[in-house]
Amino acid sequence: MAKITKTFQYGKHTVTLETGEVARQASGAVIVKMDDTVLLVTVVAAKTAREGQDFFPLTVDYQEKFYAGGRIPGSFFKREGRATEKETLISRLIDRPIRPLFPEDYKNEVQIIAMVMSLDPEIDGDIPAMIGASAALSLAGIPFKGPIGAAKVGYNDGQYILNPTVSELKKSQLELVVAGTANAVLMVESEAALLSEEVMLGAVIFGHREMQKVIQVIDSLTAEACTQPSDWVPPAKNDALVIALKKVIGGRLSDAFHIRDKLQRRDAIAAVKDDVIQQLAGRLEVEGWNLAELLKEFGELEYRTMRDALLDTKVRIDGRSLEAVRPITVKVGVLPRVHGSGLFTRGETQAIVVTTLGTARDGQVIDAVTGEYKENFLFHYNFPPYSVGECGRFGVPKRREIGHGRLARRGVLAVMPSLDEFPYTIRVVSEITESNGSSSMASVCGSSLALMDAGVPVKAPVAGIAMGLVKEGERFVVLSDILGDEDHLGDMDFKVAGTSEGVSALQMDIKIEGITEEIMRQALQQAKVGRLHILGEMDKALAAPRAELSDYAPRLLTIKIHPDKIRDVIGKGGSTIQAITKETGTQIDIQDDGTIVIASVNNAAAREAKRRIEQITSDVEPGRIYEGKVAKIMDFGAFVTILPGKDGLVHVSQISSERVERVGDKLKEGDVVRVKVLEVDKQGRIRLSIKAVEEEVASI
């Protein structure tokens, strides 16, 4: 295939799509250029599915090459290693809108690799990667119901900004990524500075409208490349098997979905499934059916049973109305030795969230393509297998845990104090101890409580809620505070976090087309009502940050010195600063601008360290009397240390009003004496006098 190039203007940026020259053995390959940011995105699809494959094996890997920013990796091996948190999050961002566009029965392995090969510091790789993945999939000749478009939306001074630069985002009240097809929004990911629901919805609609040009260009590229349509044919539906299943099941699935307890409901459905397999086992070989086919159709009947009951009765699995939030219990200060903690329980979803305060040096140093930077607010989400009553892998966080942690972090970020206002590194850890839907939003609620319990001066409490949707034709219901089954069997997972004043984070994943603006508006308004209810329940336990930090949290004292005096505080080979930290038991961080932060659980120790630093950095004042220690005896006088690192000379003539023949007759090393500063010359040399002090005392 000859090289094909398409170029278009996208916001302030020029975007170019190229195919046919690089990675020609891949099923589909596109080079995407957005100004100076360049990515190679490839797709490879297996010709057939593996034997017994019962899920769609789609893998997405996004990687930023360090050479893209003109840097060599800082790791020991000097090469790219395991995916960073940012790479994992962007991989998920690519995956989420494209996964629903593959047929349910398609089980061939598909791998997408997006490599950032040149990076303009002002243009991130996320939107080009999503555009490239959409184009490469469209060129791959596989059953993909795309293409999709993607856009980033900012908001400032009442105006939406299409694909803002990194600099513009720093001033923006909103960072929202939206992806979708020509007719439908499929995915939204955002963080916001407590904006209204109307502004958030407007951003989604604005982004979807603007991305249409991306979809049109990809369609044009695919047409010019003469991409052959997929010859994959879905397996025919086995009507005889479905009839047999329905007959054996009867009303038992419907009865199981009336059981309110999650584990009991799961066991009841499993019992029905086991009985069905046992009853139909003898017919599988005779009828030419297979077990995988039977299980698939059983899952389809589960799906239909729950959805039909919900649409017909407007009553949910656990007996709630559509808008009702599950019962909430809230506790704070549940762990005695930590700096702040909260236990948040909503129905069968529960999180223990802990806040730890540290100094600036505890911040995480990120070695990124654009350079090193430090992160001083860390949020970690853990989802152990026991939280859903299962055995499983425990330890290294999976992609889902990283994604949920980032969403929860976005939820509280808008209310966090700046480093100047609260100079601590803050780590929040959410331990999910039970899960039946919406654990990331439980983490938002729990983190708000733990932060306030730790005394972090957040601007307002934050709560989060997950919304769902079930839609069949023109009939639909919007669900507040969804269960795990409602998420799994529904058409939308719509998470909203915020305060009583506005939205701080929004994440939306939609599995179907036909979600209208009106449905999204209803979901946002219903979410607001639920969020305000949850905030009211949280306020009963703790409505504002505690006035005092935990007894076990470090106290920070901040002082400012002239940058030229930093070397005096550090001392030769670090001797001075090491002595202060060792003798006072404090931790001291010195910044290049002269800011010194002293950390200690003991207030008195911190104050002593501060006093000693102030002594070292204070200027010697002529005419002032100091108490000093004789450091060295010379023939012509004695050197006396009046401040740390500051010695002055007491000439033999200034030791006493009487004649002194030998200095050693009057002074010895280690003697503590009172001296008056006579002069500090231009070279910083200090002249001292003991005699002047004696004369001054005598005159009084």
Swiss-Prot record:
Which PROSITE patterns does the entry link to?
KH_TYPE_1 (PS50084), S1 (PS50126)
Tell me which domain of life the UniProt entry assigns to the organism this sequence originates from. Answer: Bacteria
* GO cellular component terms, A-Z: cytosol
Q: What class of enzyme is it?
A: transferase
Enumerate the spans annotated as S1 motif domain.
623-691
Which reactions appear under catalytic activity for this entry?
RNA(n+1) + phosphate = RNA(n) + a ribonucleoside 5'-diphosphate
Subcellular location per the Swiss-Prot or TrEMBL entry: Cytoplasm
- GO MF annotation, one: RNA binding
Q: Which residues bind Mg(2+)?
A: D487, D493
The answer to whether UniProt assigns keyword Nucleotidyltransferase to this entry is: yes
Instruction: Give the cofactors, semicolon-separated.
Output: Mg(2+)
Where's it mainly located?
A: cytoplasm
Tell me which Gene Ontology terms the entry assigns under biological process.
mRNA catabolic process; RNA processing
Q: Where is the KH domain?
A: 554-613
Task: Cite the entry's keywords alphabetically.
Answer: Cytoplasm, Magnesium, Metal-binding, Nucleotidyltransferase, RNA-binding, Transferase
EC numbers on record: 2.7.7.8
Indicate whether Transferase appears among the record's keywords: yes
Family statement drawn from the similarity comment of this UniProt entry: Belongs to the polyribonucleotide nucleotidyltransferase family.
Which NCBIfam families does the record associate with it? Answer: polynuc_phos, PRK11824.1
Return the HAMAP family for the record.
PNPase
Q: How does it assemble?
A: Component of the RNA degradosome, which is a multiprotein complex involved in RNA processing and mRNA degradation.
The job of this chain, per UniProt, is described as: Involved in mRNA degradation. Catalyzes the phosphorolysis of single-stranded polyribonucleotides processively in the 3'- to 5'-direction.
| Name of the featured protein | Polyribonucleotide nucleotidyltransferase
Identify the species of origin. Xylella fastidiosa (strain Temecula1 / ATCC 700964)
| Underlying gene | pnp
